[in-house]
């Protein structure tokens, strides 16, 4: 067989294989977007009662691959803003005098393995635990013109150290959270989710020396999701997992 003919046969073979396997893999893919809010927790004493003052808009996009009827793997990109202001809290006199506030963009790329323990009708809860990389760049403000007035010399010195601090503006983070999806039909789903991120940085807020502690900072993303399922859909009306697991209506438990 001539080389040109052989090349054509090989190309046709791989094209045929690609056409045959694409629906098998495509039916397990989901793409979506999130809209919601981002929230910070760290050296400024954000509390549940006052957290509403600190929530800022966030959004993201994700791609999720459903390995089987109980386990999936999601890659997600999020963007939001972290904000806190000590005037909202007043937990101690010296912090009120310090009058610190900060704002920082937060960008995240996360890999999120997730478990879907069961489906109840058209609703399906899930939990996730993963690994993320985040970047941030805090802008800070103290009481002006003299933020250290009437403060102890030691506190004044620590505030000066924080102002002059040199630190990395990237960090690894461990996302942990959960949510629920509602399957509108076999192509679309809407949902809600919330997750916290434990970071390995104490500088999301650019406070470290004057914090009075050594714990690293946290941030949170939460909101509503809208997603679309490729190929065979999400199985709302039948089997979609590609592994024999039925994720149709009713209560469905994991099959191993």
Residue ranges of predicted features:
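Membrane-spanning beta-strand positions in outer-membrane beta-barrel proteins
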Residues: 30, 72, 122-124, 175, ...
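Extracellular loop and loop/strand-boundary signature of outer-membrane beta-barrel proteins
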Residues: 43-49, 94-101, 161-166, 208-213
């Amino acid at each position: 067989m001539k080389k040109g003919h052989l090349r054509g046969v090989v190309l046709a073979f791989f094209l045929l294989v690609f056409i045959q396997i694409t629906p098998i893999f495509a039916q397990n893919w989901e793409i979506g977007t999130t809209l919601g809010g981002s929230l910070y927790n760290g050296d400024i004493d954000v509390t549940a009662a006052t957290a509403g003052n600190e929530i800022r808009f966030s959004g993201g996009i994700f791609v999720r691959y459903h390995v089987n009827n109980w386990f999936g793997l999601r890659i997600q990109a999020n963007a939001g803003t972290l904000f806190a202001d000590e005037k909202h809290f007043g937990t101690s006199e010296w912090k009120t005098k310090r009058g610190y506030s900060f704002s920082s963009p937060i960008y995240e790329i996360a890999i999120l393995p997730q478990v879907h323990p069961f489906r109840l009708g058209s609703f399906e809860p899930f939990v996730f635990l993963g690994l993320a990389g985040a970047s941030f760049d805090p802008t800070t403000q103290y009481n002006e013109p003299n933020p250290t007035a009437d403060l102890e010399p030691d506190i004044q010195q620590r505030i000066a150290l924080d102002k002059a601090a040199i630190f990395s503006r990237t960090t690894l983070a461990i996302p942990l959270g959960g949510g629920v999806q509602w399957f509108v039909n076999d192509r679309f789903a809407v949902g809600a989710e919330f997750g916290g991120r434990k970071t390995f940085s104490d500088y999301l807020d650019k406070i470290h020396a004057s914090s009075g502690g050594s714990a690293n900072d946290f941030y949170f993303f939460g909101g509503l999701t809208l997603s679309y399922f490729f190929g065979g859909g999400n199985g709302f009306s039948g089997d979609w997992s590609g592994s024999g697991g039925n994720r149709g209506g009713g209560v469905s438990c994991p099959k191993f």
